[in-house]
Amino acid sequence: RATQAEQFLIDARFPYAIGYGLTETAPLIAGAIPGRTSLGSTGPVMDGVSARLENINPRSGEGEIVVRSPSTMIGYYKNPEATKEVFTPDGWFRTKDLGLFDSRGYLYIKGRLNNMIVGPSGENIYPEEIETVINSHFLVTDSIVKEEKGKLVALVHFNREELERRYYSMKEELGNKMDEIKSDLMRYVNSKVNKFSRISVVVEQT
């Protein structure tokens, strides 16, 4: 829903700044001041910070964001194993976030490395992107997308108050109506995502 909130600010002509960082990078990696933001982007890399992508997917141009700067931590306190895990051999910090740069050098966060699902033909599928689309539906409050037996399954919390308000005259039939509502949601989502990111099942969560 972050992109929706950002679009709202743009439509309202409300000035805003944006930034991206982690505690370990103390804290900013990239950012943009009002007037220089770009929808969906965290902005360019900050002065004094170096960032690059590792293990880039040749199809999408996406890769893990790794950074180096004077403000990046030198390690976790008394935990050399964890420290070793988050640094590359040449000393860059692994954010475990996936992203890409556009031609202007603006950074776009695509998802978490640990959450990424690999499609049947090697596609990178980001549950967060699909969840954003699902959550933009007016009957949805929250969702989680996961992979089960090679299919993408959406676990969805519906807005029960809105459902009952909309279908008040047939409240007793709402249970039967849910199959149609879930099918409509699936069509809505699949019309807005890549072919390999289409969901196959919607499961209502209560």
Task: Identify the residue ranges that each predicted region occupies.
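Adenylate-forming
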Residues: T72, Y106-N135, E162-K177, K195-S200
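Ser/Thr-glycine-rich phosphate-binding loops at phosphate-binding pockets of nucleotides
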Residues: G21-T25, T95, P120
